[in-house]
Amino acid sequence: MIFRTIRIRDADDARLKAISKRLGLALSLDEMKAVRSYFERLGRDPIDAEIHAVAQSWSEHCSYKSSKYYLKKYLGSLKTDYTILAMEDDAGVVDFDGEYAYVLKMESHNHPSAVEPYGGAATGIGGIVRDVLCMGAQPVALIDSLFLGDVSSDRYEGLLSPRYIFGGVVGGIRDYGNRIGIPNVAGSLYFDKLYNSNPLVNAGCVGIVRRDRIVRSKSYKPGDVLVLMGGKTGRDGIHGVNFASTTLGKVTKSSRLAIQLGNPIVEQPMIKAVLEANDAGLIRAMKDLGGGGLSSAATEMVYAGGFGAEITLDDIKLKESNMSGWEIWISESQERMLMECYPEDVEKIRQIAEKWNLDFSVIGQVTADRRIRVYYKKRKIIDMDIEFLDDSPVYQRPYRIKEVEKSVTVPQEPEDLNSFVRDFMARLNTCARFNVVRQYDHTVRGSTIVTPFVGRPNKETHADATVIKPLENSMRGLVLTSGSRPNMVSVDPYAGTLLTLAEAYKNILSTGGRPHSVVDALNFGNPEREEIMGQFVESVRAIGDFCRKMGLPVVAGNVSFYNEYRKTDIMPTPTIMMVGLIDDVRRSRTTYMKGSGNAIYLIGEPCDNLTGSEYSRMHGYTDGFLPAPDLDELTRIRDFLSSKADMILSSHDVSSGGLFAALSEMSFGSGIGFHVDISNVSAARPTVKLFSECGNGLVLEIAKDKEEQFVDGSNGLAIKRLGETGGDRIIVDEAGLNIIDVAVDDLRGAWEHGLDRYI
């Protein structure tokens, strides 16, 4: 059957809802009424391909209908003079050195990873690479931030085991990224039972492109030819964006069919082919076929240019010969790219596709009118006003802001801190990530200067950020970091999001870079619930306030709503990917202690608050007053570190696990111990000083002969000398009394093997 007519003009409310449910449209009653009114004006009922096209374009995933208003309100003006493209195309573009630009994007692939962890995570990597590639850029680095369930829990009815999801997600990222030859260099991993049903897979990518070879995702001229290159089109991923725009139910056959199937063996030559065609100047515009498939890609590209399109589906290479027109139109099969070119360049691109053994089809042309017309087997299956398709409803949903707690709860002190810190450093959210991250290739392109792990052989520790040298003939580098603080955002969405951004900022400073740009992936529950919408609004407001204060552009983003199962929402999780610049990668700093007899300093005013910390959560406390970071102080820290860069041997930010975790991780990278006295940090209890995670703290290692020069000119910045490096033990005193004394290797063993039994 070529097409069916869907009778909606005479449908009452009940029938409209039934049509939406039966066809998997995920459109509300009001939206179905708007579709009915449109076709009433046309004097006909829609063809199946037309109503499916509307559902794709109007899905939460594609349209941002619940978030667009607030994103524009708080983030719309965040550009700088070095911003090239922000919030306009498939990825953000930022100047790198005047001649080259870097391209960056982060996307979520949450619902697919809940249903098919391996495939969902793999296609998340493939899709984000194509978002960067379609701007004409060579992908140079992958980033992934993962938020997974309690891996010790049993299978839930209708859901997959969190441990199974863990293994599948890591395996999908590993296999896709390693096979396409792009290093996976940065990210984060967080566990909580609230992610049991809704794991979050936030994938990011950074690329490099010559400024005169940047490709836009908008059409240029009527008469230009539209071509499709890459893999074949199949039934995999049909209704993927609709599925991603609703709450999760049980894992079923239909939900599995909404998952795309990735093939890195096609993606890798497609990267080569696209870059070859772009280097030859053959591509006028380009868009990845991601969520919504050809329907979204073609409509969005010509709409952005102010045009329309006429498209024929017959020559598209199919995985299954009996596919209907609407299935071809909305298929989300992976590894496909839509390109616009001059008519005289079609054969040149075809030859490049054949060289790399890729499928190639001429599918249509750009038209001057603002309509989209699609033909299949000599029948017109779509004839619609493109503005109606692409101008989805925009909702200003009501929201309620959580009342800020005034109290501060301090858990009881452990009787034996030596025993406690062994258990603490082995916890899921404080232990080493070696088992996961070592499955990824960090150095495949030969451009990774600082890898995710740094230190002496067999004594490695975590880096704060990684450094990539994207150009062969330049020492200029990109500093990359990504993560979120859902434990803090859950307590106070505004302050918690500021702390997320502050941590990313400190990670880049700690590595020797200067923060340069931001992208986000905002993961929340059901926006139809006022408290969830309130979390989102406060989080976006915090991103705007932070970036405006610190002079950073927000150049791209992604919103993932409806992350709930049976009215249980995820923790609000705004993931921040921040990119910094470093003028000379040879001046990068790392986190491990470099030698014995060096001084240890803490800079930044202590927070003296355990709210949201791993220490508090370990004791069952999840609420309380959460102070926002002092951004004026953070600015002073930035300037101070820049002026003292040559004196700093190593540095590490104070964040997850607090001051004790920061000091210990610095020690683990070399096996060198330390002896500190924390009595001058503040007047708070020892556990508060050791395990507080808020504030702007960084720990620095300074050579003894540079100390006087280092502390000179601090301009009121809080700088506390804690002690010295040396020996093979971790020793912490309070006012001259010893409170912790453990062997470095003993504590490292607990930290290093915390994940062993789960993956």
Swiss-Prot record:
UniProt-annotated catalytic positions: 61, 109 (proton acceptor)
EC number: 6.3.5.3
Disulfide bonds: none
Record has Methyltransferase as a keyword: no
Keywords: ATP-binding, Cytoplasm, Ligase, Magnesium, Metal-binding, Nucleotide-binding, Purine biosynthesis
Residues reported in the UniProt entry to bind Mg(2+) 1: 107, 558
Gene Ontology biological-process entries: 'de novo' IMP biosynthetic process
Enzyme class: ligase
Positions with a binding annotation for ATP: 64, 105, 520, 557
Reaction(s) this enzyme catalyzes, per UniProt: N(2)-formyl-N(1)-(5-phospho-beta-D-ribosyl)glycinamide + L-glutamine + ATP + H2O = 2-formamido-N(1)-(5-O-phospho-beta-D-ribosyl)acetamidine + L-glutamate + ADP + phosphate + H(+)
CDD domains reported in the protein's UniProt record: PurL_repeat1, PurL_repeat2
Pfam families the UniProt entry points to: AIRS, AIRS_C, FGAR-AT_linker
Pathway connected to this protein: Purine metabolism; IMP biosynthesis via de novo pathway; 5-amino-1-(5-phospho-D-ribosyl)imidazole from N(2)-formyl-N(1)-(5-phospho-D-ribosyl)glycinamide: step 1/2
GO CC, one annotated term: cytoplasm
UniProt-recorded Gene Ontology molecular function terms: ATP binding; magnesium ion binding; phosphoribosylformylglycinamidine synthase activity
Positions contributing to substrate binding: 108-111, 130, 260, 332-334, 560
Protein location: Cytoplasm
Keyword Cytoplasm set for record: yes
Self-association state and partner proteins as the record states: Monomer. Part of the FGAM synthase complex composed of 1 PurL, 1 PurQ and 2 PurS subunits.
Family under the similarity heading: Belongs to the FGAMS family.
HAMAP family assigned to the protein according to its UniProt record, in alphabetical order: PurL_2 (MF_00420)
Function: Part of the phosphoribosylformylglycinamidine synthase complex involved in the purines biosynthetic pathway. Catalyzes the ATP-dependent conversion of formylglycinamide ribonucleotide (FGAR) and glutamine to yield formylglycinamidine ribonucleotide (FGAM) and glutamate. The FGAM synthase complex is composed of three subunits. PurQ produces an ammonia molecule by converting glutamine to glutamate. PurL transfers the ammonia molecule to FGAR to form FGAM in an ATP-dependent manner.
Protein name as it appears in the record: Phosphoribosylformylglycinamidine synthase subunit PurL
Organism classification: Archaea, Methanobacteriati, Thermoplasmatota, Thermoplasmata, Thermoplasmatales
Gene name of the record: purL
